[in-house]
């Protein structure tokens, strides 16, 4: 299901994948998701690495994951007091501790063909 995240009247984004640990009833998301995942392509790489990185950081998205299929690389960033910090690069597995007792364990082993 595609879902828009309406940040404000002028800014609406549609990440490749979002994980949301809170309920919502509108046709679009009006609060930051817990995790945003963007899959890079040549046409989106700059925007995903720079513009969306800054936007998601400003909007307090706890985890931002960038998947780069050209280099078989997964980058996981976690929000801290002073911005995003890298916490893992191409892990086999990673556990995300989120709000509302929401914990997600992800097995990244099958993301890329071996």
What positions do the PLM features span?
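C-terminal interaction segment
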Residues: 1-59, 66-114
């Amino acid at each position: 299901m595609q879902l828009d995240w309406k940040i404000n009247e002028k800014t609406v984004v549609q990440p490749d994948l979002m994980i949301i640990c809170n309920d919502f009833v509108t046709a679009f998301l009006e609060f930051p998701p817990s995790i945003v995942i963007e899959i890079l392509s040549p046409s989106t790489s700059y925007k995903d690495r720079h513009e969306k990185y800054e936007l998601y950081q400003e909007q307090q998205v706890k985890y931002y994951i960038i998947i780069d299929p050209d280099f078989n690389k997964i980058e996981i960033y976690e929000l801290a007091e002073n911005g995003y910090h890298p916490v893992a690069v191409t892990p086999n597995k990673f556990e995300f501790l989120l709000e509302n007792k929401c914990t997600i364990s992800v097995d990244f082993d099958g993301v890329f063909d071996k």
